């Protein structure tokens, strides 16, 4: 992503969010460092026996083979083929997982990976979005699952990871239409029926909060819908309403799938259905009451937007107040359906931000999601709300993960939580050193914060590194590697090679080494510590 100059206003939130998705990186304040350092030494054995450590990928980013064996295009195929990536890359190649999955599952076993999280491509399994199942797609996922079972690797499947079938997008505008609920439920039914005898952990959607903002407010993600002044280069959309509609339909679709599973499959398959959100921890920019209120408001808009309905059956009161008639209402029947519809929640977490109030003048002109939230996001307390907005380096704050886990414990009735993405990328770099000590340091510190939250009563069930190997990164292409294993994208054979972090993770999981947080996070480090992106 190109660095831009702009004024950091509420509407800049979408841009910051996208950058965080692409290039999360280390930083931590001195206060957080001291807190994390108190965790001292730990090993795999310090975590509960049922706690799982894994790593993940997603279908479009990993599989490649986008035009093979009957797969139809997704909205990400359309987006990248239109040349909308900064480097004009596409996911056509991915990491070659469609043909190299057996090799990769062996790598997982060699790494002592306990669990693997991947997503299913809706357009590979059901190319027309509904109706006939693609035998080749079914064969691929069955074979992948069988390989994982044979290696004793716990399987975590995400049904939807941002890659909506283009054919349904063309038919009724995808998540904007309530028609998506029936089609998504029918797709999930196929997955439960065909794979549920071996899969017990199902996540319905990845990051519906990001989908709603990035694709329907700023228009940066496909299907690129927005309206001025909130987004640029969109040919259709309404940023003031559509993010709320998309989130609403996503929640209802999730609840419909959960009801299907509980009614038809759970008694025999004994599995669990949850939903995933993107999260970062929020600190008040100052001690003012306005900034403190804005910090909680930002949590409600980012986290509560999705989780309040799943746990309590309705949106946060502050969202209903700020958005008014632009946010849809749940009927009494819908509220009953969505309440308690998640057996667990998954979070993707990389960094933290500072929040200041931006409510002055918030009633002037049209309002989108970010204006309703009325909060300014900063990378650190030294940031100014002007000049270069998109930084080349982002904060690392392991304490923020602990705070988020404990917030979820206190706010959402102790619902089980999986950290489904946490990782370190070199944004803008074409190569990622095999000697990736910075990634080891990053993962060590966040794993330590996970343990600290566990010891404080957070109901955390697992931790997944993003990503198991280098993949096509959304909006960064092949130039922001996050993987534990290096992939040579210049070689048509896409050879894999374990990085230092893969060897380190393997030794930790086998109990051969411990982690000393004090050596990773020393109390005298300051809030300006960053890793290059």
Curated annotation (Swiss-Prot):
GO terms for biological process: carbohydrate metabolic process. It holds the Pfam family Glyco_hydro_1. The active site is at 207 (proton donor), 421 (nucleophile). This is Beta-glucosidase 22. Glycans are attached at residues 41, 233, 238, 435. InterPro entries: Glyco_hydro_1 (IPR001360), Glyco_hydro_1_N_CS (IPR033132), Glycoside_hydrolase_SF (IPR017853). Disulfide bonds join 226-234. It comes from the Eukaryota. PANTHER family: BETA-GLUCOSIDASE 11, GLYCOSYL HYDROLASE. The gene is BGLU22. It catalyses: Hydrolysis of terminal, non-reducing beta-D-glucosyl residues with release of beta-D-glucose. The keyword Glycoprotein applies. The keyword Nucleotide-binding does not apply. Transmembrane segments: none annotated. Its EC number is 3.2.1.21. Keywords: Disulfide bond, Glycoprotein, Glycosidase, Hydrolase, Signal.
């Amino acid at each position: 992503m190109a660095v831009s100059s702009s004024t950091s206003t509420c509407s800049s939130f979408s841009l910051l969010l996208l950058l965080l998705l692409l290039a999360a990186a280390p930083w931590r304040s001195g206060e957080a460092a001291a807190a994390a350092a108190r965790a001292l030494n730990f090993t795999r054995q310090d975590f509960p026996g049922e706690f799982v450590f894994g790593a993940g990928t997603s279908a479009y980013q990993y599989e490649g083979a986008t035009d093979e064996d009957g797969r139809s295009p997704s909205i990400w195929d359309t987006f990248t083929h239109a040349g909308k990536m900064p480097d004009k890359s596409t996911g056509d190649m991915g990491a070659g997982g469609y043909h190299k999955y057996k090799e990769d599952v062996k790598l997982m076993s060699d790494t002592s990976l306990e669990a693997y999280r991947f997503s299913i491509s809706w357009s590979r399994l059901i190319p027309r979005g509904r109706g006939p199942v693609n035998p080749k797609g079914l064969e691929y996922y069955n074979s992948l699952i069988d390989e994982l079972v044979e290696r004793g690797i716990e399987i975590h499947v995400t049904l939807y990871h941002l890659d909506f079938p283009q054919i349904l997008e063309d038919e009724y505008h995808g998540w904007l239409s309530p028609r998506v609920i029936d089609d998504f439920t029918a797709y999930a039914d196929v997955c439960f029926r065909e794979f549920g005898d071996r899969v017990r952990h199902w996540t319905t959607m990845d990051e519906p909060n990001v989908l709603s903002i990035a694709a329907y407010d700023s228009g940066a993600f496909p299907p690129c819908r927005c309206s001025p002044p909130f987004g640029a280069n969109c040919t259709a959309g309404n940023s003031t309403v559509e993010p709320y509609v998309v989130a609403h339909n996503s929640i209802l679709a999730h609840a419909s799938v959960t009801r299907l599973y509980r009614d038809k499959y759970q008694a025999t398959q004994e599995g669990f259905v949850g939903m995933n959100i993107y999260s970062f921890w929020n600190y008040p920019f100052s001690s003012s009451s306005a900034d403190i209120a804005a910090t909680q408001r930002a949590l409600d808009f980012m986290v509560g937007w999705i989780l309040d309905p799943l746990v309590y059956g309705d949106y946060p009161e502050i969202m209903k107040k700020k958005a008014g008639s632009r946010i849809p209402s749940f009927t009494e029947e819908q509220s009953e359906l969505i309440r308690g519809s998640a057996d667990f929640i998954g979070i993707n977490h990389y960094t933290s931000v500072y929040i200041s109030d931006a409510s002055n003048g918030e009633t002037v002109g049209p309002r989108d999601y970010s204006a309703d939230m009325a909060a300014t996001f900063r990378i650190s307390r030294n940031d100014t709300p002007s000049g270069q907005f998109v930084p080349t380096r982002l904060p690392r704050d392991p304490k923020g993960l602990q705070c988020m886990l404990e917030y979820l414990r206190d706010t959402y009735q102790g619902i089980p939580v999986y950290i489904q993405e946490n990782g370190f990328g070199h944004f803008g770099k074409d190569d990622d050193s095999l000697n990736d000590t910075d990634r080891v340091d990053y993962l060590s510190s966040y794993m330590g914060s996970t343990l600290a939250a566990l010891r404080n009563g957070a109901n955390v069930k697992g931790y997944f590194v993003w990503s198991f190997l280098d993949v096509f990164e959304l909006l960064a292409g092949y130039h922001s590697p996050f993987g534990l294993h290096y992939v040579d994208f210049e070689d048509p054979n896409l050879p894999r090679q374990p990085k230092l972090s893969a060897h380190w993770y393997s030794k930790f999981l086998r109990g051969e080494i411990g982690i000393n947080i004090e050596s990773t996070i020393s109390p005298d480090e300051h809030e300006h510590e960053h890793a290059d992106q």
